[in-house]
Amino acid sequence: MLTCNKAGSRMVVDAASSNGPFQPVALLHIRDVPPADQEKLFIQKLRQCCVLFDFVSDPLSDLKWKEVKRAALSEMVEYITHNRNVITEPIYPEVVHMFAVNMFRTLPPSSNPTGAEFDPEEDEPTLEAAWPHLQLVYEFFLRFLESPDFQPNIAKKYIDQKFVLQLLELFDSEDPRERDFLKTTLHRIYGKFLGLRAYIRKQINNIFYRFIYETEHHNGIAELLEILGSIINGFALPLKEEHKIFLLKVLLPLHKVKSLSVYHPQLAYCVVQFLEKDSTLTEPVVMALLKYWPKTHSPKEVMFLNELEEILDVIEPSEFVKIMEPLFRQLAKCVSSPHFQVAERALYYWNNEYIMSLISDNAAKILPIMFPSLYRNSKTHWNKTIHGLIYNALKLFMEMNQKLFDDCTQQFKAEKLKEKLKMKEREEAWVKIENLAKANPQYSLCSHASTVSMPLAMETDGPLFEDVQMLRKTVSDEARQAQKDPKKERPLARRKSELPQDPHTKKALEAHCRADELVPQDGR
């Protein structure tokens, strides 16, 4: 008979009847022995599968015995899937032990870059060399957990906190196939062992804390969040305080990490699940997102806009009122972003019917915040697609409340006139300074070295519409044109940036001459 003994972190297999090197034995099929002997043979096969083979340094070694183990694992998967009353009490410790021997191991150091440099679409993950055996061990253990014969009361002696902790450590594996099996395995354990649920949540929290505040690298964050999404969905109401703390202190800080793109869809799902459970959490969640809003990372900003729209899709009108002003101040900044994808994603909010109904109910607060940004960028944004989306948003605002739209237009004009007057005062102050400088007796000595010129303002808002009726007509026409344009097939062509024209810059460029034109040439 084969026995498996622990020696440190390695499993050493002994053959009781052999003095030479260990040789696995191809045992009979379980179905070929009498029912009375099947349990004994099942245990022998489980112990036989405790043998570990080298797939890394010498992949071609022991090919015969690797196949013996693979065949034994495949047979056991079929055996517990298609037979009832075969998971008896003596089987439990053998199954858990066999799983632990094969799976619980020290993971190799990461071969890919960490943090923001890691690109899951470009960087190839390191695949587990022993996967032909590991896959079957995972499949067998899952069938074991899912079997109608499985009894958690017996299994809890062997599937304990230590087992769960070692299982969670494997989530850092680079092999996505292994992480997928781990995700399903941990979810089954969470569902069947009520006494382990709080411990599992606590240990996942610890992994997230280390990831956020220490390492910023972990391969299994997306899978752990996917498990949590299912767990959150099952939380009873009202939510416990520990669950609210988990949202505010663990999930929301995950938005800070550079590698957010790797797990953002799963994170956004978890956040939205919480808000569907308890709408009073909306304000702290949105304010935290605004606090963590990316300043210089445009792709990450697009992710935040995606998540924010998902939140607005489930928000209660009473909660929307609490966050609308800081939220739309941020959206106004996004509309003004020179990165066209950020501006475009923000303007797509105006295509969402539920969001538009919320805006309509609170237009008196929202339109004054958004109008200056929309108007300015309708003239000056370099991307023509953005112009069309802005005119569409302005048209919707105009149809929503025409009087308010006209008031915002007049207010914007008044503010622009104030700015121009202020700029004129500054220019006059500079003229006075220049005149005082000219009155200085030393002025003539240094005037040839430098020329004092007053600062010049660059008009970036385009010409103001003097007539509100003209603005209305322009907005309607441009919005109508923008709806037609996307349907046209446009030829691929290199587009030149369209920047605001500053006449003073133009004159300075025309007056500019190269340094060698000023230096006298020999013989001239």
Swiss-Prot record:
User: Which InterPro entries does its entry note?
Assistant: ARM-like, ARM-type_fold, PP2A_B56
- State the family named in the UniProt similarity comment for this chain: Belongs to the phosphatase 2A regulatory subunit B56 family.
Protein name (record):
Serine/threonine-protein phosphatase 2A 56 kDa regulatory subunit gamma isoform
Q: Per the UniProt record, which residue ranges are transmembrane? A: none
> What does the subunit comment say?
PP2A consists of a common heterodimeric core enzyme, composed of PPP2CA a 36 kDa catalytic subunit (subunit C) and PPP2R1A a 65 kDa constant regulatory subunit (PR65 or subunit A), that associates with a variety of regulatory subunits. Proteins that associate with the core dimer include three families of regulatory subunits B (the R2/B/PR55/B55, R3/B''/PR72/PR130/PR59 and R5/B'/B56 families), the 48 kDa variable regulatory subunit, viral proteins, and cell signaling molecules. Interacts with SGO1. Interacts with SGO1; the interaction is direct. May interact with TP53.
For this UniProt record, the keywords arranged alphabetically read as follows: Acetylation, Centromere, Chromosome, Nucleus
Superkingdom of source:
Eukaryota
Organism field: Oryctolagus cuniculus (Rabbit)
Q: List every stretch annotated Disordered.
A: 476-524
